[in-house]
Amino acid sequence: DGMIVNDPIQPKDGEHISYGNIRTLQEFNDFNLKLEVNVPEGNNSGIYLRGLYEIQVVDSYGKELDSHNMGALYSRITPSEAAEKPAGEWQTLDITLVDRHLTVIFNGKKIIDNQPVWGPTGGAISSDVLSPGPIYLQGDHGNVAYRNIVLTPIK
């Protein structure tokens, strides 16, 4: 049905081993990425753009706005407003990255508007900001589900 669920890999005794990241084989320069995400209470993930820049995916409903809220460019750009829904509800992200300028529309509200991105965020798989890179969904922090993922390159 087009849904990706990030379930942990577990041995028979049920102890957690690890989660995995899901990444594209193809690499991208400029693109638009639209998706839906469901974050259970207390969980988090991230969406890495070009393998460099993390859009935070976290249960931050009702929390003070900062650069670690849902939809933020992690530790770099704080959303202009809180647009989160309560944990466990499906939410929409519409992310555009052109050159090194980022726009994020979260649940229909533009929370980052064509802001410049300066340098990779933590967890980046490269430091080359001039090259194309993969999109990957961080999978080591909890049970976050993604669905209806549409990635459109911009020429």
Give the label of every model feature segment.
Residues 1-155:
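Carbohydrate-interacting regions of secretory-pathway proteins
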